[in-house]
Amino acid sequence: KESAAAKFERQHMDSSTSSASSSNYCNQMMKSRNLTQDRCKPVNTFVHESLADVQAVCSQKNVACKNGQTNCYQSYSTMSITDCRETGSSKYPNCAYKTTQAEKHIIVACEGNPYVPVHFDASV
């Protein structure tokens, strides 16, 4: 079974590009990362930074998660991210997404030993 840390990498890491390459980025990435297999995942964020930089956020600013848990951390610096949001015309299995590139602080939930990101909570 896929570990929570590996799932985070599959769902949220794209270190190979510095930003979304085109307006079609989300349509391609959501499909290739298996985020449209059983349904269209409504919202997803990809982070264009090194895995080490994103893992380091687990030792940065401790904040409360949206669900009230206390194991979330906010990055000290902004990061290059791409938000993928399902469009109104999207219908499974033909999931369609709007691609939005941004520079924001990320908030991730961390768990385990080593202490690594397992959930993308928000960007601010």
Swiss-Prot record:
EC number(s) from the headed UniProt entry: 4.6.1.18
Gene Ontology cellular component terms for the protein in this record: extracellular region
Active-site residue numbers: H12, H119
Alphabetical GO biological process terms: defense response to Gram-positive bacterium
Major location category of this protein: secreted
Binding positions for substrate per the UniProt entry: K7, R10, K41, P42, V43, N44, T45, K66, R85
Glycosylation sites: N34
Pfam families associated with the record: RnaseA (PF00074)
Cited function: Endonuclease that catalyzes the cleavage of RNA on the 3' side of pyrimidine nucleotides. Acts on single-stranded and double-stranded RNA.
Protein name: Ribonuclease pancreatic
Similarity comment: Belongs to the pancreatic ribonuclease family.
Enzyme class per UniProt: lyase
Disulfide cross-links: C26-C84, C40-C95, C58-C110, C65-C72
Entry keyword set: Disulfide bond, Endonuclease, Glycoprotein, Hydrolase, Lyase, Nuclease, Secreted
